A protein has these predicted regions:
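Extended beta-strand/beta-hairpin segments
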Residues: 1-46, 57-103
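Alpha-helical metal-binding/catalytic segments enriched in His/Glu/Asp
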Residues: 51-52
Length: 103
């Protein structure tokens, strides 16, 4: 999988992947970002939750279970002093509502 990220202005970047869709990316305001896109850590968590949701839907569907609702929330603990500001723990809270299709 290839993704290309190009700087547009100062902390503002735009990423494009194989799907051709553009993803605006910007830094947090405290380092000079101006709200022109998603902050990279937030984008990471969107990706994690999206992957979990898609794979969960696929697995349940293959087992004959119909999903009415899938919801994934993320949270994390992060070292905020110094650099890099690494995540030390990532939490996923998954809520699924399903019903089993009769045989």
């Amino acid at each position: 999988m290839k993704v290309k990220v190009v700087q547009k202005e100062d902390f503002h970047f735009v990423g494009t992947g194989e799907s051709g869709r553009e993803v605006p990316i910007d830094a947090a305001g405290y380092v000079g970002g101006k709200g022109r896109g998603i902050r990279p850590p937030e984008l990471l968590f969107h990706s994690i939750a999206g992957c979990v949701g898609i794979h969960l839907y696929e697995a349940l569907h293959k087992e004959g279970k119909h999903t009415e609702h899938i919801e994934i929330e993320t949270d994390a603990e992060r070292i905020t002093e110094g650099y890099p500001k690494v995540f030390t723990k990532i939490y996923l809270y998954v809520k699924v509502v399903v019903f089993i299709i009769g045989k």
